């Protein structure tokens, strides 16, 4: 009986290795070819605060990048809270296992996949400011998401306003969309 099980397992393994691997998810397409898409990313802080979750945010931005043309993605809107805490260097295993800098770097790295391909607009959240949650207004947002890094912002950003430090930043900016069929 053991010999039969080993033979069966060997045949299944051998046949599975001969099957072609799927390189990408099934191609996406719009129901109405005249329409376009805007993608909404919810608070990514849950992805960035644990190192084990960070690849999930990478997968989200990879999927977006892979579908820009087929879904006619005109913009990615992010509700903010890129990080759990803006300026915390103390790890708390129950709440997070990344420092704030590591969280900012993970968010920035995931979003880089979209640079020069599609504009992404981030509404900075309360967790993106202060030490824990906006108590002093300081943020690393412009250090990790500077205007210059994504050329697609030039076409739709109508203004960058000064932040609390007097620095023009995407954390306080205005965008304008001019697409047929919009609005």
Protein language model features and the residues they cover:
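Short amphipathic alpha-helical segments and helix-helix/interface helices
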Residues: 9, 61-65, 108-112
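Sterically constrained small-residue positions within well-ordered secondary structures
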Residues: 12, 29-32, 168, 177
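Bacterial Sec-dependent N-terminal signal peptides
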Residues: 1-23
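N-terminal active-site segment of His-dependent metallophosphoesterases
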Residues: 18-98, 173
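Extended active-site neighborhood of metal-dependent phosphoesterases/phosphodiesterases
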Residues: 89-183
């Amino acid at each position: 009986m053991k010999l039969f099980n080993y033979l069966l397992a060997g045949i299944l393994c051998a046949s599975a290795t001969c099957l072609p691997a799927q390189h990408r998810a099934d191609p996406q397409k719009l129901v109405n070819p005249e329409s376009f898409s805007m993608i909404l990313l919810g608070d990514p802080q849950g992805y960035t605060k644990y190192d084990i979750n960070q690849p999930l945010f990478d997968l989200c931005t990879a999927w977006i990048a892979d579908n820009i043309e087929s879904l006619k993605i005109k913009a990615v809107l992010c509700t903010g809270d890129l990080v759990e805490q803006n300026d915390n260097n103390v790890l708390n295993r129950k709440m997070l296992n990344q420092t704030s800098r590591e969280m900012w770097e993970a968010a920035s790295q995931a979003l880089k996949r979209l640079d020069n391909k599609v504009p992404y607009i981030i509404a900075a959240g309360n967790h993106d400011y202060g030490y824990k949650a906006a108590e002093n207004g300081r943020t690393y947002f412009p250090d990790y998401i500077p205007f210059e890094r994504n050329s697609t912002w030039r076409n739709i950003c109508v203004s960058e306003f000064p932040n609390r430090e007097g620095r023009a930043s995407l954390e306080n900016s205005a965008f304008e969309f001019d697409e047929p069929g919009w609005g």
